[in-house]
Amino acid sequence: LTSARHDVFNKSIAEKYPESYDAAIPYELIFSGSKSLTDKIDIGNGQTITAGKLVLSPTRTYAPVIKQVLDGYRDQIHGMVHCSGGAQTKVLHFIDDLHIIKDNLFPVPPLFKLIHEESKTSWQEMYKVFNMGHRMELYVPQEIVQDIIDISQSFNIDAQVIGRVETSAHKQVTIRSPYGEFVY
């Protein structure tokens, strides 16, 4: 979130709120984007939201979903990865000799498109740094996939199969997105 704020918002934030950044950081790196808090951002379907609300909007918790999934399927879950703090490559910390192929990802939300546009960060780096709209991965057998999707949807949280796992000579993640194929 700190990176997003500095990548998206302009220097007027630093001038108005000098306590919002560490004075030891080079000035050219702080609030280097072009947006103000009140700039309208297109979020699709003819709707807009201010940049401030978009960047600072709360994140829903997965706790109720995960509790219900664990209550019913704990012994069938092969892995769970919360993609914050490691993004789409975080799973690399937990595997050996597996290839994780993510080729059916959710659409990238407007917030991450805005960060990409403002920061000029490559899409490959975006998937390595940000969750890109999906924060939780469950690695489960095909037989229980629909049950888990149904549980998630009962809490009005979208869920879908985003890829698959294959054996490999080494650990690897491949992301296939509208913005390219990236191998980590």
List the predicted regions and their residue ranges.
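Helix-biased detector of long, well-ordered alpha-helical tracts
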Residues: L1-Y184
